[in-house]
């Protein structure tokens, strides 16, 4: 094109870029992208449990196509991130901000996490017409509200010192996403998988009509293997071990049955790595 000039070079605001090209951040604009939004926020709460804080996560379906995710972990620290901007606001509204950087140097607030790029929650915020985040700790509840990634308000309430955790609520924006109705079945499947990967962590799903369902695993991957093999037609007793050294942990469950096909599932920091050829090859050897 002969008319390609300097004025053709544009610069988009961070949240404007996410809204214009959501696929780069959440994978797609369809049901899979919406499910990924839920996974991003759920993973933040799971990371609290993996770092020794909290033992329950509540997922509630709300009216007007909303969903909330609440944990009883440590809560995001109170304080001022920059003049006029709280730490809570920054975690969901300031690019490249978070508490999971530098895990390997000891300067992070987390020893392990499913993500550490400071993007997930902000991407969900950007594609939401309404986004609310709350942190509860040290006798104080902070609440921030956004719309389409833009900060709307901040307020504080005094609470009991024993209450801790993080709460996030979002309503997907139909102007950005092609699908804004949550797939309850898909979310339950995702939560069930997480319950096997995080033994000892209880998940409670509350539907809009008030009915609830709990997901909890005491034996982790051992329970998962039995779930995947409901007939329990094992040729020999399954092998299971869970070992830790320093900040590293390895959990393995292996069982053989009389079927002709195999099921292999591999995870790293709760992220499904089954499609990795290198992992699969080393596993089979």
Regions found by a protein language model. Give the residues of each.
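GHKL (Bergerat-fold) ATPase N-terminal catalytic module, capturing the glycine-rich phosphate-binding loop
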Residues: 1-172, 177-178
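GHKL/Histidine-kinase-like ATPase module
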Residues: 185, 192-194, 200, 204-285
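Generic signature of intrinsically disordered, low-complexity segments enriched in small/polar residues
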Residues: 7, 18, 28, 64, ...
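A short, contiguous, amphipathic alpha-helix enriched in charged residues
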Residues: 34-43, 84-103, 188, 221-233, ...
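Short intrinsically disordered coil segments
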Residues: 74, 147-150, 181-188, 267-271
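Active-site-proximal structural scaffolding
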Residues: 84, 117, 161, 180-187, ...
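Generic recognition of flexible, low-complexity loop/linker segments
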Residues: 56, 120-121, 190-192, 239-241
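A short, sequence-level motif marking secondary-structure junctions
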Residues: 83-84, 146-151, 183, 216-224
């Amino acid at each position: 094109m002969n008319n390609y000039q300097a004025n053709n070079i544009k610069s988009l605001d961070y949240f404007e870029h996410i809204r214009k090209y959501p696929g780069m951040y959440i994978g797609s604009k369809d049901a899979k992208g919406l499910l990924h939004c839920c996974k991003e926020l759920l993973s933040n709460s799971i990371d609290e449990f993996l770092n020794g804080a909290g033992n329950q996560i509540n997922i509630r379906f709300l009216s007007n196509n909303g969903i909330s995710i609440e944990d009883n972990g440590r809560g995001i620290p109170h304080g001022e991130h920059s003049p006029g901007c709280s730490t809570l606001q920054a975690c969901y509204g300031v690019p490249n901000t978070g508490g999971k950087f530098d895990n390997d140097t000891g300067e992070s607030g987390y020893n392990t996490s499913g993500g550490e790029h400071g993007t997930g929650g902000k991407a969900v915020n950007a594609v939401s017409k309404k986004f609310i985040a709350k942190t509860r700790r040290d006798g104080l509840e902070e609440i921030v509200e956004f719309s389409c990634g833009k900060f709307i308000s901040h307020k504080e309430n005094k609470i009991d010192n024993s209450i801790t955790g993080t709460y996030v609520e979002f309503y997907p924006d139909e102007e950005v996403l092609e699908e804004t109705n949550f797939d309850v079945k898909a979310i339950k499947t995702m939560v069930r998988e997480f319950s096997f990967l995080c033994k000892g962590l209880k998940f409670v799903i509350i539907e809009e009509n008030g009915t609830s369902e709990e997901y909890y695993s005491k034996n982790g991957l051992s329970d998962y293997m039995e779930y995947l093999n409901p007939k329990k037609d094992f040729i020999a007793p399954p092998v299971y071990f869970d070992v830790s050294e320093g900040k590293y942990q390895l959990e393995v469950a292996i069982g053989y049955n009389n079927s002709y096909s195999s099921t292999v599932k591999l995870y790293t920091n709760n992220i499904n790595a089954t499609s990795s050829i290198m992992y699969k090859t080393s596993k089979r050897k």
